[in-house]
Amino acid sequence: MTSSSTPRHRGIFPVVPTTFADTGELDLASQKRAVDFMIDAGSDGLCILANFSEQFAITDDERDVLTRTILEHVAGRVPVIVTTSHYSTQVCAARSLRAQQLGAAMVMAMPPYHGATFRVPEAQIFEFYARVSDAIAIPIMVQDAPASGTALSAPFLARMAREIEQVAYFKIETPGAANKLRELIRLGGDAIEGPWDGEEAITLLADLHAGATGAMTGGGFPDGIRPILEAWREGRHDDAYARYQAWLPLINHENRQSGILTAKALMREGGVIASERPRHPMPELHPDTRAELLAIARRLDPLVLRWAH
């Protein structure tokens, strides 16, 4: 039996950015290089097709191409989480089964929502995750993020963990994340196999103190985040604090300034990928914001700026 003390997956699982050519098509050669860099940088696993992967700008056919291409290229080097969020229970279940068939180690799904106003009651959220669970034999990570506009209380999340077979991991990104993680672990006990930090590691130390065993971050500097997690896990808390303080300016800049385009800007600057452009209509990173990002990063000498040279 797995539990929070013996999870199947722990550590840093950064989000893989989706790479596009300047013309907007998928750039699979760059995609493979991005994956190789992220593994070389110390990622314990990867997450694909998340919000930070611009999943909302990708067609269903492209989802299949990306999932197959990345999982075949990873070839078991690290476990891969595939994001399968959708408003429809049927679509999310089908996406999740397809991810499992292609080799995913886990799926991640937000609660069903659409736009700014379409939400469903708690009973339907429970049934949504239960039906997805029934369709697959790999763990589900519930993504509790403000983007869904859906309140998921710690008691409700703990109930799903106890009563739905595959619901075992939780990425908490809401305000007061550490307190919610702490309460979730208290209420759910061993059913909470993976309490995870998210939101680009901006609350990482508080979340680790609350009991988080994993972190889903941006993909630009896993080599900076992994040693923090390792130090904390090994009881070297002063070392963890010192390392976090060193990387915090870059973590903060990603979380509050350069956002979803951070990893691609760093990867493009380091020669890992050919283009950092997002898919239209998302605007490109402002030149001043990009320059500040690189100035902060160069002080830390992350692998991303050296890997391809």
From Swiss-Prot:
Keyword Lyase applies? yes
The domain of life for this entry's organism is: Bacteria
Signal peptide (residue range)? none
Residue ranges annotated as coiled coil are none
Keywords assigned? Arabinose catabolism, Carbohydrate metabolism, Lyase
Classification via InterPro entries: Aldolase_TIM (IPR013785), DapA-like (IPR002220)
Keyword Lyase among record annotations: yes
Give the main EC class: lyase
Q: Which GO terms describe its cellular component?
A: cytosol
- Supply one GO BP term: L-arabinose catabolic process to 2-oxoglutarate
Q: Which GO terms describe its molecular function?
A: 2-dehydro-3-deoxy-L-arabinonate dehydratase activity; 4-hydroxy-tetrahydrodipicolinate synthase activity; protein homodimerization activity
Catalysed transformations (reactions): 2-dehydro-3-deoxy-L-arabinonate = 2,5-dioxopentanoate + H2O
The active site of this protein is located at 171 (schiff-base intermediate with substrate)
Q: What is its EC number?
A: 4.2.1.43
Give the record's family classification: Belongs to the DapA family.
Subunit: Homodimer.
Record function comment: Catalyzes the dehydration of L-2-keto-3-deoxyarabonate (L-KDA) to alpha-ketoglutaric semialdehyde (alphaKGSA). Is involved in a degradation pathway of L-arabinose that allows A.brasilense to grow on L-arabinose as a sole carbon source.
Q: What protein is this chain from?
A: L-2-keto-3-deoxyarabonate dehydratase
